[in-house]
């Protein structure tokens, strides 16, 4: 298997609410390849998909069982501590739940966490040790 992921799919409890959060709230552009029940958001090398959670579980032949923590977090790497603060303020206004307010962290950066409308955990972090290229991709 090549060292590459192309798509991250988040299961949603309320598909339209989730699409509105990302599309209208955050201003992300939905791909024209999106279809009923599947919203696709190109993120520069990887695509975020939204799909009803129950249907996603059924497709994997699993029974959907809610949990507080799935073991998965998504991360947005900000360019400054101020951007971390600004993003967390923005998503709170959009109805996201702030789980951990922005703060200095043990690894030398600055980060906070929020849950989107379906409870997916998203970190907003500034890491002074990591650089971003001209397309905002991590240089590792």
Residue ranges and their predicted role:
Residues 10-13, 80:
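Short, surface-exposed ligand-recognition loops at beta-strand->loop->(often short) alpha-helix junctions
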Residues 26:
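Major-groove DNA-recognition helix of helix-turn-helix-type DNA-binding domains
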Residues 18-23, 91, 119:
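Conserved active-site tyrosine of GNAT-family acetyltransferases
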Residues 9, 16, 85:
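Conserved catalytic core of two-component sensor histidine kinases
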Residues 12-14, 106-107:
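Conserved beta-strand-loop-alpha-helix junction that forms the acyl-donor binding cleft
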Residues 1-6, 29-81, 85-115, 128-140:
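Vicinal oxygen chelate
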Residues 124:
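Short glycine-/small-residue motifs
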């Amino acid at each position: 298997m090549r060292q590459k992921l192309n798509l991250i799919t988040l299961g949603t409890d309320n598909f339209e609410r989730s699409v509105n959060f990302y599309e209208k709230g955050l201003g992300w552009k939905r791909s024209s390849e999106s279809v009923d029940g599947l919203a696709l958001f190109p993120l520069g090398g990887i695509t975020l998909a939204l799909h009803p959670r129950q249907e996603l579980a059924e497709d994997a032949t699993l029974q959907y069982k809610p949990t507080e923590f799935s073991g998965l977090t998504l991360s947005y790497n900000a360019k400054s501590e101020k951007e971390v603060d600004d993003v967390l303020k923005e998503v709170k206004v959009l109805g996201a739940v702030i789980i951990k307010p922005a703060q200095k962290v043990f690894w030398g950066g600055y980060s906070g966490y929020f849950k989107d409308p379906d409870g997916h955990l998203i970190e907003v972090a500034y890491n002074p040790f990591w650089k971003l290229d001209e397309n905002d991709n991590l240089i590792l």
